[in-house]
């Protein structure tokens, strides 16, 4: 086990890291979103969705975990002395209905648990496939010694166990009856519209840096807010902190070049194409990008 050693690229059975090379007969990509674009094309077969959680003290204790059946519903679970209230999910980088997502959760908490107090809050994201079934198995037809586990759609605790058994069985030569269900190379015909809509979205976002001309300047950005502005004839993303210091970044994602959008709830720059995220100073927060801005 090589800890604190990020893999930068992979070629056949060799992993390249900043400190050297590692050879392996079998390689498992269990890294949330596969950072190798070709082969596999996972960036074209998934997107990432982000959701938000507030931890409440002095709220009711619930046994088990609960989630609403509707797309915009909420989830509940107890953890020690806290009740975790989750919801307000959205596609990463989607500006529709953005901002005040934590506030909306706090409003629900005040309505449902008026005696509760907020202890902390956070957000996270996960990969979503076209048919909502994870990709678990061999990475691609041309890389039979590579394996992948991704697209858990926020069901990581159960799906991780499934992935462990499926990949173990394949590596050890055992037959698993569920192998075809999770096969990464599948392409459900009924979900072709998902691929088409995702493809159109990516093309649109890739074209934005060339055709979208922001009308704002740094003076138009209020303290505590961020946005895309024109500076010396080029587009940049800026965040103006409460002391009115300006933090500027390159606005194109280093993964495949999509234009980033500002997430006011997390004060981050998010990629609407494949879900990479960066803090307001450009530091990488989430992949598949492998470097900061």
Language-model features, listed with the residues they occupy:
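Short glycine-rich, flexible loops that bind phosphorylated cofactors or substrates
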Residues: 36-37, 92, 261
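Flavin-dependent oxidoreductases
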Residues: 6-77, 205, 213-219
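A glycine-rich dinucleotide-binding beta-alpha-beta segment and adjacent secondary-structure elements
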Residues: 119-127, 145-148, 205-252
């Amino acid at each position: 086990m090589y800890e604190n050693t990020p893999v930068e690229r992979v070629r056949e059975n060799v992993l390249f890291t900043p400190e050297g090379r590692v050879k392996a007969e079998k390689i498992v990509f269990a890294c949330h979103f596969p950072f190798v674009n070709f082969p596999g094309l996972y960036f074209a077969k998934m997107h990432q969705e982000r959701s938000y959680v507030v931890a409440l003290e002095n709220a009711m204790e619930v046994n088990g975990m609960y989630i609403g059946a509707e797309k915009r519903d909420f989830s509940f679970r107890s953890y020690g002395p806290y009740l975790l209230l989750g919801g307000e999910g959205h596609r990463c980088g989607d500006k529709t209905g953005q901002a005040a997502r934590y506030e909306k959760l706090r409003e629900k908490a005040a309505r449902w648990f008026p005696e509760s107090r907020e202890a902390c809050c956070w957000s996270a994201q996960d990969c979503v496939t076209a048919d909502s079934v994870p990709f678990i198995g061999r990475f691609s037809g041309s890389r039979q010694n590579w394996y992948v586990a991704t697209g858990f759609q926020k069901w990581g605790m159960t799906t991780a166990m499934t992935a462990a058994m499926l990949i173990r069985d394949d590596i050890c030569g055992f037959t698993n009856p569920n192998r075809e269900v999770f096969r990464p190379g599948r392409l459900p015909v009924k979900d072709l519209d998902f691929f088409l809509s995702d493809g159109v979205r990516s093309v649109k976002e890739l074209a934005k840096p060339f055709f979208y001309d922001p009308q704002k300047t740094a003076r138009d950005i209020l303290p505590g807010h961020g946005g895309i502005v024109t500076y010396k004839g080029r587009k940049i993303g800026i965040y103006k902190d409460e002391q009115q210091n300006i933090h500027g970044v390159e606005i194109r994602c280093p993964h495949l070049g999509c234009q980033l959008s500002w997430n006011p709830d997390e004060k981050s720059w998010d990629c609407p194409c494949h879900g990479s995220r960066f803090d307001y100073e450009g530091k990488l927060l989430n992949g598949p990008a492998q470097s900061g801005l």
